[in-house]
Structures are given as C-alpha cells and as structure tokens.
Amino acid sequence: MNKILSAGLVAVALVATGSAGAATTTTTFPVTATVATNCLVSASALAFGTYTQGNGNVNQTSTVSVNCSLGTTFNVGLNAGATPAATVTTRKMVNGANQLAYSLFSDTGRTTNWGNTVGTDTVARTGNGFGVGNVVALTVYGQVPDSAANQVLPAGNYTDTVTVTVTF
C-alpha cells in the first residue's frame, strides 16, 4: 500500500510541477495588403462586311470590354488607327495605296466621334470590380460612309488596326 501511495504522490508532484512550470505569453502582428488600382481591356473585331459603292453607308458595331477595380474612374480612347494621315474623325482602311474612309462613334446615332483625348472625345465610366459579371461593355458604332471619295476605290480587302487605350 505504501508503494501505491508513494507512486500516487510522485504522480501528483509531477503534474503539479508541470502545471506550475507552464507559462504562456502572446503578442499580435499586423496583417496588411494594398489592393492596386488596375484595369484590363479587350475588344472584338469590327467587320464591316461588304461595302457596295453607291448603296449607302455601311454600319457595324464592335465591343470594348473593360474590367477595373471597384470605384475606379476610367476613360476609354480609340486612336486614329495605323494608316498615316488618318485622324480620329476620319480613319482609313488600306488596300495597297488605296484608302477607304470610316468613322467610329460612341452613340447609336453615330454623331459623337470616339477619339483618344481624355475629357474631349473619350468615354468615361467607373469600374465594377473584377469577376464574373463585372465587365463594363462599351459598344463602338462604326460606319463606312458612302462618300464620293469611297465611291471611286478599286474592289479589294481593306484593313486597319485601332488601338484602345484605357486611362485610369
């Protein structure tokens, strides 16, 4: 019985010693992150199809899709294209030395020219954030006018490349 009692006292002493010797301390540390202001842009092709001289203007659309950080104000501009001597009011598709005029607008009536000068002829919007369903889709309204200059061009395929710039 003494052996059992002695063993029990030793066990209690060890537990008591373990409890008395266990101490803790705590601290905190800050956790931070900065969400960067950011925008991503993509655009679909603008294909006018076939322009038949003397049959009226040809109208088509394209879409510029922009994702920007939530609450970020941005401007979307379209440059004059890659053809020398083109302007944002009269862009030019080329086929060799021949140039087919066209224009890009920001409204369905095709009266508001879409250019590349912030505060003058760009389109301003506010970002919805990133993720599914948050894209800001902007329609580009294109027109090949049935103008006198366009009516004297040879048949063929005419092309240009327009650069989209998002300023934020």
Predicted regions and their residues:
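Bacterial N-terminal signal peptides that target proteins for export
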Residues: M1-G8
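Polar, enzyme-active/binding microenvironments
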Residues: V12
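N-terminal signal peptide c-region/cleavage motif recognized by signal peptidases
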Residues: T17-S19
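N-terminal small/polar-rich segments of proteins
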Residues: A22-A97, R125-F168
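Predominantly extracellular/luminal cell-surface or secreted proteins
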Residues: G77-G81, S103-D107, G115
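Contiguous segments within soluble domain cores/interaction surfaces
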Residues: N98-A101, T111
